[in-house]
Regions:
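Transmembrane-helix signature of 12-pass secondary carriers
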Residues: 2-225, 258-531
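TPR/TPR-like (Sel1-like) alpha-helical repeat modules
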Residues: 223, 231-238
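Extended, hydrophobic alpha-helical segments
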Residues: 234, 245-259
Length: 531
């Protein structure tokens, strides 16, 4: 499929009045601060693996530092998956909440259920308490994802959007690694107690150091505050310095009521809408309000209007694309096995203990995610995704074939599955786990972006919940080697799907990406020189 090409030069060429370095530093600093939230996300995602590994083994019970709690296989399957089924509820709630209270305060409110979840886990006395803690942690995970991704898409320049949108995935992996590492030297209750500090720090960081999204402020008819927020995000520049970018942002968001649209056609403005506006200006006596009526319409839409907009190509085409991506993502990352990784590693037969393999593979995932941050702007999302998906598929197929060979052909070499596992976790962190979340911040238009991103995150984790809850049953049906082969085969099919349907969005404006998904290829080729 032909790739997108940006319809304009880098944003800095049009805004040479203020310092580019300060602008970059302000955006990077803001995104790093808000991503303290995602550190708690990663710890929440990892804690079921730690607890299940401590409280359940093949004979049913493992004593963890004198802890008398136990988990049956059924309780473990529910505990490992209830986190993921509560995530969609939080995701749907965040889609509505961030439109009401704003991106900033939606991110700040994440800390409340997360703090409750860690406290309940610390004081847990039975399986029900574990479920309650996962409900709270799952809600906090769902509440955090959509506003963080939406905020990046609305505040970061195209030249930085790719690397900074992958920072959240890196922070998630960092949180998981820290949780795994702590679990090797202390009981899981102590891990939960220490983790209670994370939501407190993240709440303070977001409230004190993060400005509200300019796009959301525009949608609430607060242009003066929006301009100040944009100026802060561009290196504490003056509002006069960001006037040009503010006008472009206002037009794209559909809230500008005064500027001449024709000068922005080459920047990605829909030419059909421009023509209609000019038609109304010529054929009505009210030449000033015609533009206002058309462009201000988006800011007056309600919740039901936003839901109706899902029937439009601007929303439903990227929605169906990204949901299929997430379906294959669930298999390629091997995330349904995450709560049971200690048992999986033990069955494969590796040269080191399962607990330290967990730490080691989390380091590889973390390194892969960091490499993504450093290379995505140069290499692009599409080639990174295709190569990583293919290598994850071959790694899982290789592990499955190896395990079959040890059963039927008496062949064994523990370093072969170790190398394949290393490849699986490294490339899942490099080009599979972060990419769809990066796309969520880019592919949706302003109208409905908050709800669409929340719904996407919710359904993605609902799929993951179903696969996680059924993992042990599927393992009984297919055996673990067969399950690796099934996962690898589905990932290979997903690679072919993405090869056919995934556009390149790196260094492209949001207008360019929107044109791609509405299928306006004629205008697209004229504006972007598609090859």
């Amino acid at each position: 499929m032909a790739e997108l090409k940006s319809s304009k030069l880098d944003a800095e060429n049009a805004r040479n009045e203020y310092n580019l370095f300060k602008s970059s530093l302000a955006q990077i600093g803001t995104i790093i601060v808000q991503n303290v939230i995602m550190l708690g996300f990663g710890m929440s995602l990892a804690i079921p693996t730690v607890v299940i590994g401590s409280l359940m083994s093949d004979d049913g019970v493992v004593d963890d530092g004198g802890d008398t709690m136990t988990l049956t296989e059924t309780e473990a399957s529910w505990y490992g998956s209830v986190l993921l089924v509560c995530h969609p509820t939080g995701g749907l709630l965040s889609g509505v909440l961030q439109e009401i209270v704003g991106r900033k305060w939606c991110m700040a409110l994440v800390s409340l259920p997360q703090l409750v979840g860690w406290y309940v886990l610390w004081r847990a006395g039975n399986a029900f308490d574990l479920y309650v803690s996962c409900v709270a942690l799952g809600l906090s995970m769902g509440l955090s994802e959509a506003p963080v991704l939406t905020y990046v898409g609305e505040t970061v320049e195209p030249r930085l959007r790719g690397p900074l949108s992958s920072v959240s995935t890196f922070t998630i992996m960092l949180g998981s690694f820290v949780a795994y590492l702590m679990s090797t030297v202390m009981p899981w209750r102590t891990v939960a107690m220490i983790n209670m500090a994370v939501p407190v720090v993240s709440f303070a960081a977001v409230v004190l150091l993060t400005p509200e999204s300019p796009v959301w402020l525009l949608s609430r008819n607060r242009p003066a505050e929006a301009k100040k927020s944009l100026a802060y995000l561009r290196g504490c520049a003056s509002t006069a310095d960001v006037e040009d970018e503010f006008s472009e942002l206002s037009i794209y968001a559909g809230f500008n009521k005064s500027v001449d649209l024709e000068q922005y056609v080459d920047c990605g403005i829909d030419q059909r809408r421009l023509s209609y506006v000019k038609y109304l200006q010529i054929n009505t006596n009210d030449t000033t309000n015609a533009e206002i009526d058309i462009l201000a319409n988006q800011s007056q839409t309600g919740f039901l209007d936003t839901l109706k907009s899902f029937w439009t190509p601007e929303l439903n085409r990227p929605f169906f694309f990204i949901m299929l991506f997430f379906f294959f993502w669930s298999f390629a990352t091997f995330i349904p096995a995450k709560p049971y990784l200690i048992a999986v590693f033990s069955e494969i037969g590796l040269p080191c203990t399962a607990q330290w393999t967990l730490v080691y593979t989390s380091i590889l995932t973390l390194v892969g995610t960091l490499l993504n941050v450093l290379t995505v702007a140069k290499l692009g999302k599409r080639p990174i995704t295709l190569v990583s998906m293919a290598l994850c598929a071959f790694s899982m197929l290789g592990i499955g074939i190896y395990m079959v060979s040890t059963t039927y052909f008496s062949f064994s070499s523990t370093w072969i599955p170790m190398i394949l596992l290393n490849a699986l976790f490294f490339f899942s962190g490099y080009g599979v786990f972060p990419i769809p979340w990066m796309l969520v911040s880019e592919i949706y238009p302003t109208k409905g972006r908050g709800i669409a991103s929340g719904l996407t995150a919710a359904l993605a984790f609902l799929m993951t919940f179903i696969l996680t809850k059924s993992f042990l049953e599927m393992q009984e049906w297919f055996t673990l080697p067969g399950l690796f082969i099934v996962y690898g085969s589905i990932t290979l099919i997903g690679t072919l799907y993405l090869y056919a349907c995934m556009p390149e969005t790196e260094n492209k404006t949001l207008q360019d990406i929107e044109h791609f998904f509405i299928g306006d290829l004629d205008d697209y080729e004229d504006c972007n020189n598609l090859s």
